[in-house]
Amino acid sequence: MINSGIAKRYARAFFDIAGEDKLYEKYYEELSGFARIVQGDRNLKEFLANPVFNQAEKKAVVEAIIQKIRMSDMTTNFLKLLVDKKRIGMLAEIADYYRVLMDEVLKRVRVSVKTAFPLPADVTSDIKQGLEQMTGKQTEIVVEEDRSLLGGIVIRVGDTLYDGSIKTQLSNIRNLLGEAV
């Protein structure tokens, strides 16, 4: 997707500048916070993404929001640049890519854990410790319940999927039996 490449470039540029101060998390919180405000208001989101409205109007709205939530000059200038370059509509995607870059530098990895039933805290802690040893990075675990798994666990670490669900095991058995017939 063309916008993906553009969003990555803007995220990389902002991240590189943020690296001078080593305030990666602060700038991420400001960027993602502003993105949440935009995403949370459908009218604002449509207004900023609509090319019919002129850039001066968009910039005035962005500046008014910035005044209310107070953020660093660095993030303020970056948001104004996005308005000037007609890229403010890509802010959520830019913030997502920035997070990926930040996690890489800070040696963190986001992990998605899906189970059919709620996990006890001690099991979640054991999974976290095991993944930290395996990856050599600090892990941030998001646990989701998915009753369709029937049992077992599915763990996604970056692009790698570890699927120990009963649903997948039954599907594999079904495929094997289908091939044998």
Curated annotation (Swiss-Prot):
A molecular-function term among this protein's GO annotations: proton-transporting ATP synthase activity, rotational mechanism
Keyword field: ATP synthesis, Cell inner membrane, Cell membrane, CF(1), Hydrogen ion transport, Ion transport, Membrane, Transport
Broad class of where this protein is predominantly found: membrane
Compartment(s) where it occurs, according to its Swiss-Prot or TrEMBL record: Cell inner membrane
Name this protein carries in UniProt: ATP synthase subunit delta
Biological classification of the source: Bacteria, Pseudomonadati, Thermodesulfobacteriota, Syntrophia, Syntrophales
Keyword Disulfide bond: no
InterPro entries: ATP_synth_OSCP/delta_N_sf, ATPase_OSCP/dsu
Gene giving rise to this polypeptide: atpH
Superkingdom, natural source: Bacteria
Keyword Cell membrane: yes
Membrane topology recorded in Swiss-Prot or TrEMBL: Peripheral membrane protein
